[in-house]
Regions:
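Active-site metal-binding motif and surrounding structural segment of the metallo-beta-lactamase
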Residues: 45-98, 179-180
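Metallo-beta-lactamase
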Residues: 93-146, 152-153, 231-233, 237
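Active-site metal-binding loops of divalent metal-dependent hydrolases
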Residues: 8-9, 52-54, 76, 138-140, ...
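Short loop/helix-cap segments at secondary-structure boundaries that form the rim of catalytic
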Residues: 63, 87, 106-110, 126-128, ...
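Short, hydrophobic beta-strand segments that form beta-sheet elements in well-ordered domains
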Residues: 47-51, 71, 95-99, 117, ...
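Conserved beta-strand hairpin/beta-sheet module of binuclear metal-dependent hydrolase folds
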Residues: 1-59, 144-161, 180
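Glycine/Thr-rich phosphate-binding loops of Rossmann-like dinucleotide-binding domains
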Residues: 13, 58, 81-82, 106, ...
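Cap/insert and terminal regions of metallo-dependent hydrolase folds
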Residues: 165-240
C-alpha cells in the first residue's frame, strides 16, 4: 500500500493569493507551496483518491495521471470535493464512496457528471482492491464529516480530514497504534478555531495515540515552515 500526499494545505492553499507573509514569500521563492489537502492510495495497480480538491487536475498530472478506481469523500466543504468536476470528459462514471449525507450534498453539485453512488456507514468496514477501509466520525461543525482508516499488509494508516479536538471515543479507539497518522492542524498553537485543531492539539493527540509516524495536514499559510511533523506535498509512505 502506497500513500501519496497530493496536497497538504487548507482551503486557501499556500501561497495565499495576495499575501506577503513570511510563509507565502517562502513558498513563492522556493516553489514549495501547499495545494489543497488530498491523498492518493495505490495498491496492486489500483488507485483510491481521498477527497477531490480544487487543485485536482494539477495534483493528478503531478502524480503521473493515474486512472482513479475509486473516490472517497470526507465531507461537503468545497476544498474537499469541488475538484470532482475535473473528471468531466476524462473518466466516465467514477465510483464514489462516502457517508449518505455527504454523497447527497456533494452529488447534488455535479448533476452534469454521472458517477456511481456507494453509501458507507461510520465504523462499518468495507474492502476495495485488497485494502480494508473503516470510516469514522469526527467533529467539524456544522459539516457531517468522516475520516478513514486504511489497512493492508498488516499496516494501518489513519486520515482524520478536518476535525476539532472533540473526536468521539469510538473513533479514537480506531486511531490507536497506527503505522501512520495524518491529522488536521490548521494553525499554530497560539490560535484557536472552533472547527479545526491547532498544532498543539494535533501533537498532543498524536502523542496519546502512539502512531509509528505522524504528520500534520490541512496546514494554513500562517503555520511556520520549520515546525516538526508538518507534511509536505508529494510525501510518500509505503507499506508492503
Amino acid at each position: 500500500m502506497k500513500v501519496l500526499l497530493l496536497g497538504t494545505g487548507d482551503a486557501i492553499g499556500t501561497p495565499k493569493i495576495g499575501c506577503d507573509c513570511p510563509q507565502c514569500r517562502h513558498a513563492q521563492e522556493t516553489g514549495t507551496g501547499r495545494l489543497r489537502t488530498s491523498l492518493l492510495i495505490e495498491e496492486g495497480g489500483r488507485h483510491i483518491l481521498v477527497d477531490t480538491s480544487p487543485d485536482l487536475r494539477q495534483q493528478l498530472l503531478r502524480a503521473g495521471s493515474p486512472h482513479i478506481d475509486a473516490v472517497l469523500w470526507t465531507h461537503g466543504h468545497y476544498d474537499h470535493f469541488m475538484g470532482f468536476g475535473e473528471f468531466y470528459r476524462v473518466q466516465k462514471c467514477p465510483p464514489v464512496y462516502a457517508a449518505e449525507p455527504v454523497l447527497r450534498y456533494c452529488g447534488g453539485t455535479f448533476r452534469f457528471l454521472e458517477f456511481e453512488h456507494h453509501p458507507v456507514e461510520p465504523y462499518v468496514p468495507f474492502d476495495l482492491f485488497g485494502i480494508r477501509i473503516t470510516p469514522f466520525l469526527v467533529r467539524h461543525p456544522p459539516a457531517y464529516t468522516c475520516g478513514f482508516v486504511f489497512e493492508a499488509h498488516g499496516s494501518r494508516v489513519g486520515y482524520t480530514s478536518d476535525t476539532n479536538r472533540d473526536i468521539p471515543e469510538k473513533s479514537l479507539d480506531l486511531l490507536k497504534d497506527l503505522d501512520l497518522l495524518l491529522l488536521d492542524a490548521l494553525v499554530p498553537s497560539h490560535t484557536r478555531i472552533v472547527k479545526h485543531m491547532n498544532y498543539l492539539d494535533a501533537c498532543t493527540l498524536a502523542e496519546s495515540l502512539h502512531p509509528k509516524e505522524f504528520r500534520c495536514i490541512h496546514v494554513s499559510h500562517v503555520m511556520p515552515w520549520e515546525y516538526p511533523h508538518l507534511a509536505e506535498d508529494g510525501n510518500v509512505f509505503e507499506y508492503v
